[in-house]
């Protein structure tokens, strides 16, 4: 399974793509002036067409190698995106080399991936927290009965962690560091395990390296 974040790093002078995926994410939030690391998907939809195309093209090349066969592609999208946004995703995949592109709503894909029998008449509630959107849906008989998509998800959690660390400790951390904090000690409810997680960053006042320790009580919703 190929697992790559939707991040690109490019030269700010000529817009040339330097790296994609994990390599680009490593420098997200801490790039020198001539390199820009960005996420071309905003709230689960295409915000930068060219960069989105580059990401899809990169993933296809990494998966298929130098194959001359144009693949069929299935892409997950938020459940409430517009027809215009759907067409933008399909066009980006087409320009990247896909022969046919099919879209599936993220809650339905999450249910299938979790082993839920989506064809069952009994309804199942699925909450899919992605990077840009959180989708909540009731799934029954192979489809979505009712759903709601909100533009608050993992990316916003990371931003809130960055803001918290900067406000409380006068320390600046990058998006990748904030995500690691979220994964390791983030919790909807404070845990009582007493686990502490070390965060390394840069002092906001003097610019020197520093570190702090936080617990799930600090990072809980």
Show which residues each predicted segment covers.
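Nucleotide/phosphate-binding catalytic cleft detector across ATP-hydrolyzing
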Residues: 1-129, 137-221
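Conserved Rossmann-like nucleotide-cofactor binding loop
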Residues: 132
């Amino acid at each position: 399974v190929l697992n790559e974040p939707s991040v690109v790093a490019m030269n700010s002078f000529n817009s040339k793509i330097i790296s994609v995926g994990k390599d680009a994410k490593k420098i997200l939030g801490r790039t020198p002036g001539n390199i820009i690391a960005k996420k071309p998907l905003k709230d689960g939809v295409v915000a930068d067409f060219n960069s989105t195309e580059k990401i899809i093209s990169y993933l296809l090349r990494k998966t298929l190698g130098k194959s001359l066969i144009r693949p069929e592609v299935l892409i997950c999208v938020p459940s409430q995106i517009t027809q215009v946004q759907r067409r933008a995703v399909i066009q980006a995949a087409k320009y990247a080399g896909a022969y046919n592109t099919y879209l599936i709503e993220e809650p339905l894909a999450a249910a299938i991936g979790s082993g839920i029998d989506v064809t069952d008449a009994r309804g199942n509630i699925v909450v899919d927290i992605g990077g840009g959107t959180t989708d909540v849906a009731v799934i029954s008989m192979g489809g979505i009965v009712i759903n709601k998509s909100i533009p608050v998800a993992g990316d916003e959690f990371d931003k809130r962690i960055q803001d918290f660390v900067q406000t409380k400790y006068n320390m600046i951390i990058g998006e990748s560091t904030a995500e690691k904090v979220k994964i390791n000690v983030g919790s909807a409810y404070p845990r009582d395990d007493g686990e502490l997680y070390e965060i390394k960053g840069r002092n906001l006042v003097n610019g020197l390296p520093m570190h702090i320790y936080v617990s799930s009580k600090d990072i809980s919703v």
